[in-house]
Amino acid sequence: EVKTPIIYNKALWETSGHWEHYRENMFLVNSTDGEPMGVKAMNCPGHMLIFKNELRSYRDLPFRLHEQTPLHRNETSGVLTGLTRVRQFAQDDAHCFVTEDQIGEEVERLLRLTQRVFNDFNLKPVMRLSTRPDEYLGQREQWDHAEAQLKSALEAVDAHYTINEGDGA
């Protein structure tokens, strides 16, 4: 488990692509030096910094990070409703860094863990496979490969799921 800072400078948000694609949903502040900064709306950039902080070998993979810290989102009124539209929340979040050939096995492991936890509480998971959006980062072939791996893992654990076309991130 890790804890990352609640505010990052503009440069990190630009590097991650969030400044261009998500800035309107972020709370923005200026440092005492006038430098633009963003209050953390997601954990991804901080986890990337942790991963790249030292030289790693493929033998170090999978490399797993988990965090439960407050996130803040400045979402427009009416976008979401009820408890799904809040300005501050704690997200139980994880990032797994893997090689391409570890994707399926790692996702399958996580799905089995999710199923065990849900079963322990007599809950039924609702699973959705969100596919490549119209505007996406990366290569189309990478998305196709990742989507195929995700679908294969869902089927391997006999999960009931729906496909959300174009809703991936």
Residue ranges and their predicted role:
Residues 1-169:
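TRNA-recognition modules of translation machinery and tRNA-sensing kinases, especially anticodon-binding
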